[in-house]
């Protein structure tokens, strides 16, 4: 259900596009550096959006680096590393795990089960690191599955379960940055009045909720012929 949040490349300046690519490639490199090469396949454009949004409240400015990677061994690519990048990578791996779990349960796919064996230890580590996040995702996935099984005829009710997942993801991202002391805005900063942690957490949650509803509806439109 992910992969819908993409850039409009024609509307970006060259510098802006380079920053976006830096986040996208930075997440990929971050996953590979911390978890190995195979999990990098979980990367999606949505992760770059999440990282850029969260990084916008970080204290440290972007610091692009030029590095090689497995996919681009000859020409160096722009990479950006920060706490938001690491968090976005962690979230993509968690969502990939739950997608594999659903595939293995509903469709009995050998690929899903085999990949889960390879990702199981990573999932366990992430679950220890983000217990509340995992609990929230699991509860709402169960709610969504129950609604789909009951053939719920309310699109808003069904969409809300997925929207809640995105809300939790965005809120946990802000909490993670504060816990890592990545957000420290000086008293004279013009955004100081909006720098209250609870305000940022609630605002990020609203962004995530509305984005989640849009993603759910767009995905439903894409699959409408298959589901009718």
Residues covered by each model-derived region:
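Acidic catalytic motifs of isoprenoid enzymes
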Residues: 1-206, 217-228
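Membrane-embedded alpha-helical segments that form the functional core of polytopic membrane enzymes
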Residues: 207-212
């Amino acid at each position: 259900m992910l992969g819908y949040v993409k850039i409009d490349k024609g509307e970006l300046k060259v510098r802006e596009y380079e920053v976006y690519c830096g986040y996208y490639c930075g997440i990929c490199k971050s996953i590979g550096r911390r978890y190995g090469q195979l999990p990098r396949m979980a990367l999606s454009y949505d992760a770059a959006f999440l990282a850029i949004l969260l990084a916008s409240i970080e204290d440290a400015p972007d610091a692009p680096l030029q590095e090689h990677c497995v996919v681009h061994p000859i020409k160096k690519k722009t990479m950006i590393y920060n706490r938001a990048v690491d968090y976005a990578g962690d979230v993509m791996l968690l969502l990939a795990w739950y997608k594999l779990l659903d595939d293995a349960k509903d469709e009995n796919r050998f690929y899903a089960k085999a990949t889960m064996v390879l990702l199981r230890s990573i999932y366990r580590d992430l679950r220890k690191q983000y217990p509340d996040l995992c609990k929230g995702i699991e509860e709402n996935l169960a709610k969504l599955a129950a609604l789909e099984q009951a053939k719920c005829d309310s699109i808003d009710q069904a969409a809300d379960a997925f929207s809640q997942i995105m809300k939790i993801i965005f809120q946990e991202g802000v909490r993670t940055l504060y816990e890592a002391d990545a957000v420290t805005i000086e008293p004279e900063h013009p955004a100081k009045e909006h720098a209250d942690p609870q305000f940022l957490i609630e605002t990020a949650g609203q962004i995530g909720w509305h984005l989640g509803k849009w993603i759910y509806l767009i995905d439903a439109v894409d699959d409408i012929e298959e589901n009718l």
